[in-house]
Every structure is written in C-alpha cells, then in structure tokens.
Amino acid sequence: MTTAHILGFPRIGAQRELKFALERYWRDGASADAERALVDTGRALRAEHWRIERDAGLDCVTVGDFAWYDHVLTTLAHVGGLPRRFGFDARALTLADYFAAARGNAAQPAMEMTKWFDTNYHYLVPEYSPATTFGPGVEWLFDEVREARALGYRAKAALVGPLTLLWLGKARDGLVERLALLPRLVPAYRALLARLREAGVDWVQIEEPIFSLDLPDAWRDAARPTYEALAPGAPKLLVATYFDDASEHAALLKALPVAGLHIDLVRADAQLDAFVADYPADKVLSCGIVDGRNVWRNDLDRSLARLAPVRDALGERLWVATSCSLLHVPVDLAHEPRLDEELKTWLAFAAQKTREVAALRDALVKGRAAVAAEFDDAAAAAAARRTSARIHNPLVKRRVAALTDADARRASAYSVRAAAQRARFGLPLLPTTTIGSFPQTPEIRRARAAFKQGVLDHLGYLEAMREQVRIAIDKQLAYGLDVLVHGEAERNDMVEYFGELLWGFAITSNGWVQSYGSRCVKPPLVYGDVYLPEPMTVGWASYAQSLSAKPVKGMLTGPVTMLQWSFVRDDQPRATTALQIALALRQETLDLEKAGIGMIQIDEPALREGLPLKARERAAYLDWAVRAFGIAASGVADDTQIHTHMCYSEFGDILPSIAALDADVISIETTRSNMELLDAFETFDYPNEIGPGVYDIHSPRVPDADEIERLILLALERIPAQRLWVNPDCGLKTREWRQVDAALAAMVDAAKRVRQKVEEEAPA
C-alpha cells in the first residue's frame, strides 16, 4: 500500500516549550534538576509530536528529527565528530558538553553558525582537520527509538547523510579536502545503521540535500562507493533530497544500492519525469508534494492529479510526503485564535500538513470519494483564495505594471549626488553613526506587553516610546555621533513591525519557527497584494529629528529582506511580490523626505540569503532583487542620502550586484574578519561610500578606542578617507546600555583621533 510519511516535525513545541526549557536549563547553570526538567520536556514533546503524526494517519512516525539545539550538531554527536578542540569524550558526551559546543564555554568559542541551505534555519558548522576521527557517540537516537516503540509506533529514523555532513563542514588546520575524511566517517555510519536495524528500525531516511546543488565531480563520484559500503547490514535506506532540482543526478541516485529515494516536488516539480522514467523496480519513490517550507494549504485535487500517474507507474512503491522537514513551519494552526477566519482557511501549519499527506495517500489508495469532504473543503478554499478581493488589489497591479527601468535608478550619478549631500550635511571626514537599533530594555518590553494586553492605552504607549527616543537621542549627542538614529524602541522585529502596518501582510499570534537553538522567529504572512495605507515611520523619525540639529536617519527594512523573512504567497512570482513591497517602501521614503528626513537607510541583510541554490538561476534573482531595491530607493532627490546595511561573511560573488544597488552609503559587518572583507571592495573598486563595522556587537565584550583606531586605520588602507564611515557591525538591540555607552564613546574617540591624523597628513 502507498505509504504516507513526513521528513520531520518541528521540535520547539506548540507553545515553544523547548525554547523555555532550554533557557531555564542554561539560566539554572545546567543543574541536575534543570537537566531532568529539560529531558522530561524533550520526551513529552516527542510523544506529542508522534501522537499528532499517528492521529493524522501517517504510516510511521519519524524519530531522529528532534534535536536539543541543532540536528547537524546532533548528527555529529551520533558519530563522535564534535570538534576536537573541546576535548570531549564522544561516547560519554553530556548535554552540558553538547551545549558548550553550540554556545561556547570559558575555554573555547562556540562553533560557527550559518544558514541551512537557502532557509532561515541556522546549523552549526562541523569543523574538520587532519586529526578528525569518528566513532561511536551518544545514545540519544536509540533512546528515541525505544520511546517510540514503547508507545506502539512504527518508527522511521532520520539522519543527515555522510556526504552532506562533510559538505556542510569547514576544513581547518591544513586539511585540504573534506572528502579525505570519508573513509573514517563511513564506518561510524555503518555501525550506527547496524545498531538501528538491531533496534527494530525498518527504514532510515538518510538526508543528502547536497544532491540538489551543483556538485563537483569528486562529490558525485563518492556517492556510489559510500552507499555500497553503508547498505549491507543496514535497515532499508531512503536517500532524501530536497530544496531544489536533483534531476541532473537522477541516474546516479537511481543506481545507488538503496531501497528508495525522496524528491522535492514543491521546489522542483519538473524533476519528477526524470526520476519516474526507468525507475528501478526495487526502489520506492517518495514524492514531497506537501510544502514543508511555506504555510499555504495544499490544493489536494491538483496534487492528486500529479501523483496519480506515478501511482499507475509504481503502484505501492509510491510514497507520499512533505517536500522537506516541517521544521520550517509553525506547529499548529489551532493555536491562532485571533487570526482572521477566512485567512485561516487558506493555511496549513505542521499538524495540518501531516493530515494533507495522509489524505493524499487515502485518495490514491481508496479513491477521492473516501476523502471527498477534505478534498472538497480544500478545493473551496483554493477557489476562494484565487478570487478574493483581499488578495487582489487592482491599484497595486496597475502600479507594478507601470514601472519603468528609470523608476529603479537615481536621477543622477553618485558623484553628482555626493556633492549635493556634502553641501547639505557638511559632515566631517570619517563621519560616525550606528546601524539603527538600540537596546530593547526591560522597560521597553514591559510597555509593549502592557499595550498588547490592553493595560496601557495607545497614547500611554506612544509617550513611553517617545521617552525611549529621547533617551536614545540624548545618548548619541553625548557620545558625539555625527549622524543619529531614533533607536527603534517601537519595533519588536525589523520585519514584523512593517508587516503589521502594510496591507497584504498578516501577523500570527503563535506562528513561531526555530531559527537556531532556543531562538525562534515569527515570520509574517504575505497573503495578498502589498499596499501602504499610511506612513509607517515618519512620525518616529520626525520626532527624533526635532530633538537635534544633527541629521537623523529614517530606518526601513528592504524589500528582499521583507520577502526572505516572511511566509510569501505562492500564487505569483516572488519577483512580483518584491516589487509590490518595493513600491510601498518607495512611498515611505518619499514621505520621509517630505517630512525633512535627509538620510534614509534601507536595510538588506537578506539579499545574499536569497541566492538560489543553482548557479544558473542566480543572475535572474539578482536582477529582480537589485531592481526592487532601486524601486524603493530611487524616488528621492540628489541631496537625500540613501544608506543600506548588509551583514555577510563573504561578498565577492555578488559585489557587482551590491554596486548596482547604488546606495550612497553601505555599512557592512567586518570586525571579526579584521577588515579583510574590505579586500573584495578594494579589488572591485567599489565607487560609493562604505562604513565597515569597527565594533563587534555580537559579543558582550567592549572594545577600547585603541582597538577601534587600529581597525579604522586598516580600513583606510583599502578605502579612501573621503568615502569611509565609522560605525558598529550591526544594530545594538541585543546589547545592554552600559556596553553601548562605553563602546560608542570609544568609537567616536577613535574616529576623532584618526580624523586628526588624516587631516594633519593631508597636503596643504
């Protein structure tokens, strides 16, 4: 019979139980009582998630999708591969050890974090050296198998695959090629798989998403010998790809000695034909047709029509699944009592998606009539969504259609604008500023909570936030900063804040997803055409500007970042939605300019994150991303200065696109790289002004003026003084005022010192 399964379920719990248990554990110093409470929370969450999967009608539950912090770190713990610098005993690894690797300890910094492929989830980056070894590790996966079996469930285990585990890591200490470690890693996997078989596990989902990438030949060539070594003595192996098209590797994957393959039909529907053609008779094909990365309800009839020919070709060897793990979506729509009822009918969170998978299985096996009520309801919701006036705004569509190339370009070249801006603002050499946000203090959080709970009225809330703006301006004047910001006290999140004010966005009450560890985010929903009904930031910026003669920057989140950090409608191209957001932001920039705000910062920290996994698709993405920024930024006069901020670890491959944004000033995160990131800008001969970060805001450590002066001098080796700004790496919302006070005072002092040196050395 056709099998229904999911690749994984969210870990955090419907009420973020894991988040709060982790934070209690860390706060209580990892005491024995705190550890027992954390372990109990994890066990209860797993049992609840398996119950949801069973009640939905899935044929098996997934174990191994749970992780205390991150599934890549947990996989390393299973195969004894945590970084050697921590000195942990792999077989006796404790939770405290595990969290030390994730968060650092007194002796060692934390492992690096980066984005999981093109998602907004962060994984901990494995560290590989010539001395890296693998072997038996923790028992956690086997504990989960025993828990599931004790509850009467048929368990399918999930593991990150060995090739992906190596690919995701970084080579250190002279290691030339990560693949050189494969002969050491494969035996550890083989032993782990053999033990799973002994534990009664029939199937292991072994995840190799790197087969959705443009893989070098050496990595492709490693696949067959790896799985020839793993298959004997293992349970049945289901090799899972997801996030993009794996069809260029279809022949290779179909030839692997495994029991099945999984492909993502949401991100890459066209690859199905390449896999079904000549599909081996000894393999199942798991079709990921329910979206694991977005929140929209499945069009069950459309999915059934897509799967029916596959069922006819493969029979019971067709499996129905989510496209990827449900880690990336909220847990349960039932916990959204305040969300608009019509909008709710268009949505499916993790709990609902498990049922969609099972319903499709039932229709394939028993016929649509067996699940007619569910299918009819889904069809009605899809029809309503297609025609809803709430989604389709003719005015917005006309405005997008009327856009021209000129709308995405400033009226004058940078050199002309720079002269106009120098005349308007009269800033000193090496002007000092910050990136935007200041500490979100307990007072701010209490006022926001009281306002949301109805305890504090609107006027009371406005006055509380205005007081925070006054504090921020007074402090910046005391530091001696040249360009000020209002501090963003009123913003709970740089995307959600705007989502609450733009038409076409909706905000959930409990739509949390895990970003990393205990960090959760609540992405807005972009459900319809985006429109700006009234100014969003003008009041705050104008009030701040009224408190000082120095320029105050208006602060906006850019269109691509708004898109990347939201759940975006799937009924039109993302590029179209980006242009709609850009038009709304364009109106906001014009409103700010009209109110006398002469500097406007449009942040795009997610521009690089949006790059498609396939190289052939990146140029098209960068074209519309740059155009969207241009639409947002280009309506203003020459003497209005546009800033942007980006925080990446590498810029080289997208520098032409960054230059094409044509922002007057770009600030970037460079402190940890010791200004080496500026090398790419120097080589490229970046033409506009740059503010390389000189203060690492991600650390509680406060730099002194000498340290910051050294960094400014390093920056001057690469960037002319006339185009150099001085600023922190990023926003300061996560820091404490005592840290900010000391660091920014030191930054201004350092800038003044270097300014004096440059002016003294300038030819008379």
UniProtKB/Swiss-Prot annotation:
User: Which reactions are catalysed by this chain?
Assistant: 5-methyltetrahydropteroyltri-L-glutamate + L-homocysteine = tetrahydropteroyltri-L-glutamate + L-methionine
UniProt-annotated catalytic positions:
698
User: Where, by residue number, does L-homocysteine bind?
Assistant: 435-437, 488, 603
Cofactor binding notes: Binds 1 zinc ion per subunit.
**Which metal ions or organic cofactors does this protein require, according to UniProt?**
Zn(2+)
- Tell me which positions the record assigns to the signal sequence: none
What the entry lists under Pfam families is as follows:
Meth_synt_1, Meth_synt_2
- Role description: Catalyzes the transfer of a methyl group from 5-methyltetrahydrofolate to homocysteine resulting in methionine formation.
The record's family statement is: Belongs to the vitamin-B12 independent methionine synthase family.
Q: What is this protein called?
A: 5-methyltetrahydropteroyltriglutamate--homocysteine methyltransferase
Q: Which organism is it from?
A: Burkholderia pseudomallei (strain K96243)
